[in-house]
Amino acid sequence: ACFSTAFEIKVAYLGPEGSFSEKAAKKHFGSSTNFVSCGSIREIIDSVEDNSEYYGVLPIENSTEGLVNSTLDEIIESNLKICSEISIPINLSLLSKKNIALRSIKTIFAHSQAFAQSQSWLNKNLSQVTRKDVTSNSQGVLQSKRTNYSASIASIEAAKKYDMKILKRNIQDYKNNKTRFIIVGNHDVSATKEDKTSVSIITKNKSGALSDILEKFKEQKINLTNIQSRPTKKNNWEYM
């Protein structure tokens, strides 16, 4: 781990309060830690880069929807170090400020990942309802709280936090739905002999380039758990 004890740490997470990111942060660091709610992935990274006592908690992968590309892209561009990871169950509930019938709902607020993870239920029960993306599910709860005939998708903890009614529990498409979060910081990471390593590589655009790289991992008997292609954002159709 890379958690320094020389100062009182602060942990930035994707808020507002009641988000799954906050839940992951508290599970990893303990509820007595100083937590800072941020409005975006970029804001979390900026906070950590600008403050040596900060750590950040970022959603990186969902068990059903795959990698969170917005996090991946921001991490690649930063100089932060991945210190640790934690996975938590993601149980999604449909919330509203009042106990209203599903047929009365006109708008649903949620993060794009929440929409994707519950799309089968939504298509079956609320197919005609307008879906509006927000930066986090907790933000969606706040939006719904201010909007009549609306609902949001979030955790039971968020429902309690913001005094929302639970219209339907566990609307996620898969019961064993989990999200993996990474902990990022400025400090070097000590080896534990049970580590994961993330690397970004840009190769020449030639036949066999990927095969050549994979051969090096094979020679060193390194197991690869994931390979992802992302645009370099420097030249069109160029990937790392």
What are these regions (language model features)?
Residues 1-240:
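Domain-level signature for soluble enzymes in the chorismate/prephenate branch of the shikimate pathway
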